[in-house]
Amino acid sequence: MYLEYTEFISEGAEDVTEEEYARHEMRAAKLIDRMTHGRIRDETAVRPCVRAAMRDLIAQSIAAEREDRQHGGREIASVSNDGISVSYAQQGDMQAHRALIRARIIAEYLTGETTEDGVELLYAGTDA
């Protein structure tokens, strides 16, 4: 586990149950493992940048799930106040936007980080 529930809560997260946290933590950890090609899975000490990425990924995932519940799974694309008009984004656009946010979070925290052998964590080639 890259980030404990107590750490997540201590960094300002509010109104998140342990059950809700566990579900989103697992998704975030799997995403980090996939994007780093498993290079950090067996490290004994969790890097601060990985903790920070986990915190932001979990928070983003929880916010997205709550937004889906609030708007029936649809993301608001625009709102017109005078005529009281609400437009919703297409489902594919919403998923692509969220994937881009997750990729940016990972890139922000893990770009430039290397293994003990000098291989960048996000490098997609072979570690030869």
Which role does the model predict for each range below?
Residues 1-128:
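Divalent metal-cofactor coordination and adjacent catalytic microenvironments
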